[in-house]
A protein has these predicted regions:
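Generic alpha-helix initiation/capping and coil-helix boundary signal
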Residues: 12-15, 19, 366, 584, ...
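Bacterial N-terminal signal peptides
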Residues: 17-28
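Intrinsically disordered, low-complexity segments enriched in Ser/Pro/Gly/Ala and basic residues
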Residues: 8-11, 25, 496
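Soluble extracellular-acting proteins and domains
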Residues: 561-664
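Residue-level signal for mature regions of secreted extracellular proteins and peptides
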Residues: 23-24, 58, 637
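N-terminal secretory signal peptides that target proteins for export/translocation
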Residues: 1-15
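A short, amphipathic alpha-helical segment
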Residues: 1, 548, 552, 657-664
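Feature marking well-ordered beta-strand scaffolds used for ligand recognition
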Residues: 30-598
């Protein structure tokens, strides 16, 4: 979810800068053997290519979906970053760096603003549970009283970095009832409902900011040793929220789910990034920037002004001067800057080989019904056992040099697959250009076999985007199409993509929506931060614009019956990172969906498909004992069709029998 890579220590920042401007990059050759991927559409024919730029008047292209509404963020929030979404009842709650924005989406064609509550922080990601709303705060501008302006003091009890708890019984007037402070803030968080504990909910906190001073929050410590119980690294913080008194929410454990992980290499810059870095370096050199060699890689790096300015000030003071540094002062710094950089790199703490160089999760998706979670943890993808909420256990960990930043995770409905997204470039860079590798900044799909993750394939947005559009895999959710694994996903300015990953080795796009760049002349942030299916609609948080609502339309990939069956699934609330198990109520559209899928597979004779459909239609027109008899007869006749797809035929049979009614 970040619009930039997470903040790190000063040495890490310099190292990151070194990578960003490196001219020669060594890329570890340990990428997976990449399976065949579907070719990208021809740019000459894909309607998403070449769209007109504009903030509120950009060109648009859609395929197999229809946009039903587009609403602009309200004054005071427009121009500030829109972030993640959560849903409760008829409301969509949209995070924004200025505070939560609440929309009434009961009419998907006309979202209505309910309230926009000022409470600045980043990222202000949102979750809900009953009458409670939770909101992440990580940056130093957050205050415990929700007032703007931040906190000037380096140590202050007014600073808020953690998870806020609101009472939204009156959703028009959210009431702040608790600030749960954490050592690294809360970049994102996940609400976990334990089926065995009805008195509490739990929150897994993913913090990626620098560690706070223990003078500001007791117990915070920066020790890198994984076995140090006081360390704030290599931990996720677990908050317990007592439902009888949510104001007493508190951190109850800091769990280490990283122990024993190895450092893993990732790919370096793409060819386009190398070219851009070379140009940037040339411009910086011509402008008189301070440049040194990275002592680890030998690459040139531009020293950031925030490091140079204090050094120049020191030289000026040392000679008894004041004001702006002169040419001699600059020359003095140029003479020693390489030695300073060498010492900086040498003095930086180096974790041992047994400790991951990524010491945090970006996002954790929990699946309470199955007692498992998927941790997207920057350098690794994790499979966790969460049957005991305060003691998560790592079952497996995977790494991939094609992945730069393990960002988010989604299970399929039966929990046999797990998809991870890679936010290569941190979300603020163009990573869907023609020359960008299809396995970089993509999704990686794994099957879960004996509690282990087995890689199957990658999926990446197939449409090429421009160099002025931030684009990479981001947040999404399952669409409840029965019998299939179908997901809608945001790709920032790449728009939204709906794809089928039922066949884990061959995922395929089946619907999309995209806009042109926010600005055709420069990189300007925008696009879909997250898009989730909620009660019949796909609702997207548009970073720069507001809120979009869309719906699927029938196509060769999705039938009207499948869409109708999906719309029978209704939730009272939804946190996409707290993945609910999808269950379909009995309906004729459900049965018809399975018949459509058998036809699409092509292994049942068309005349037989027609017979099945005719029998379903006839049964639908009857009632009582007559309907029950018709459904029983058709169900028994389907046994002869199991040779095509036994699992699908059994689902159809069950759907038919579930439609039987009790006859008095």
């Amino acid at each position: 979810m970040p619009l930039r890579p997470p903040r790190r220590s000063s040495m890490s920042f310099i190292a990151h800068r070194a990578t960003a401007v490196a001219i020669v990059v060594s890329i570890a050759a340990c990428a997976r053997n990449t399976p065949p991927m579907a070719p990208r559409p021809n740019p000459a024919t894909d309607p998403r290519v070449g769209l007109k730029a504009g903030l509120l008047n950009a060109g648009e292209a859609s395929s197999n979906m229809r946009v039903t509404a587009k609403v602009v963020s309200p004054p005071g929030f427009f121009g500030s970053t829109n972030s993640d979404l959560a849903f409760t009842g008829k409301y969509a709650i949209q995070g924004n760096y200025n505070g939560p924005v609440i929309w009434d989406v009961s009419d998907p064609s006309k979202p209505v603003l309910v309230t926009a509550f000022s409470c600045p922080a980043s990222q202000n990601d949102i979750s809900v549970y009953r009458n409670l709303m939770f909101m992440s705060a990580e940056a130093n501008n957050g205050r415990t009283d929700c007032l703007p302006g931040g906190v000037a003091d380096t140590v202050s009890k007014l600073r808020m970095r953690g998870v806020r708890v609101f009472d939204i019984t009156d959703i028009k007037a959210p009431k702040l009832i608790a600030n749960v402070q954490t050592c690294r803030g809360s970049h994102t968080h996940t609400v976990l409902e334990d089926p065995k504990d009805k008195q509490n909910v739990y929150i897994y906190v993913s913090g990626s900011a620098g560690i706070r001073s223990p003078n500001e929050l007791a117990g915070c410590a920066g020790n890198l040793e994984a076995d140090d119980p006081t360390s704030s690294r290599l931990r996720i913080e677990i908050i317990k929220v007592p439902l009888a008194d949510p104001s007493k929410a508190a951190v109850v454990r800091r769990a280490n789910i990283f122990a024993g992980l190895k450092n893993n290499p990732s790919h370096g810059l793409s060819d386009a990034d190398k070219e851009a870095a070379a140009k940037s370096l040339a411009v910086a050199r011509a402008a008189g920037a301070f440049i040194a060699k990275n002592p680890q890689s030998g690459a040139d790096l531009v020293i950031p002004p925030q490091m140079i300015h204090p050094m120049l000030d020191s030289v000026v003071k040392a000679r008894g001067g004041s004001g702006t540094a002169n040419a001699a002062d600059s020359a003095a710094i140029r003479g020693v800057i390489q030695a300073v950089i060498n010492r900086t790199f040498a003095a930086a703490p180096a974790p041992s080989g047994a400790i991951s160089d990524r010491s945090q999760c970006h996002d954790i998706t929990v699946y309470p019904a199955l007692g498992i979670a998927g941790g997207a943890c920057e350098g690794h993808g994790l499979l966790l056992d969460i049957s005991d909420p305060v003691n998560p256990i790592r079952l497996d960990a995977v790494a991939d040099s094609n992945f730069a930043y393990w960002h988010s995770a989604t299970f399929n409905n039966d929990g046999t697959k797990l998809l991870f997204s890679d936010e290569w470039g941190g979300g603020s860079s163009p990573k869907c250009r023609a020359g960008d590798k299809p396995e970089w900044g993509a999704d990686a799909i794994f099957t879960i076999e004996n509690k282990k993750l087995k890689f199957q394939s990658y999926y990446k947005l197939p449409a090429v985007q421009t160099a002025n559009e931030n684009c990479v895999a981001h947040n999404g959710s399952l669409i409840p199409i029965p019998g299939r694994d179908v997901m809608v996903q945001s790709w920032y300015q790449g728009g939204i993509s709906v794809f089928d990953w039922t066949d884990a080795k061959h995922p395929m796009e089946i619907a999309s929506f995209d806009r042109g760049p926010v600005d055709s002349t420069r990189m300007a942030m925008g696009g879909s931060w997250s898009v989730y299916w909620y009660n019949g609609s796909m609702i997207s948080s548009e970073i720069a614009r507001g809120l979009d609502v869309a719906e699927l339309v029938p196509s060769q990939y999705i039938s009207q019956n499948e869409i109708d069956a999906a719309k029978t699934v209704k939730w009272t609330y939804l946190n996409a990172q707290g993945q609910p198990k999808i269950e379909w109520p009995a309906s004729f559209s459900l049965a018809k969906s399975y018949a459509d899928q058998l036809e699409r597979k092509g292994c049942v004779n068309p005349s037989r498909i027609a017979e099945i459909r005719s029998s379903i239609s006839s049964a639908e027109k009857t009632s009582g004992a007559q309907r029950n008899a018709a459904l029983t007869k058709l169900s028994s006749q389907l046994d002869g069709d199991r040779g095509c797809d036994a699992k699908k035929v059994d689902l159809l049979k069950k759907a038919l029998l579930d439609l039987q009614t009790t006859v008095m």
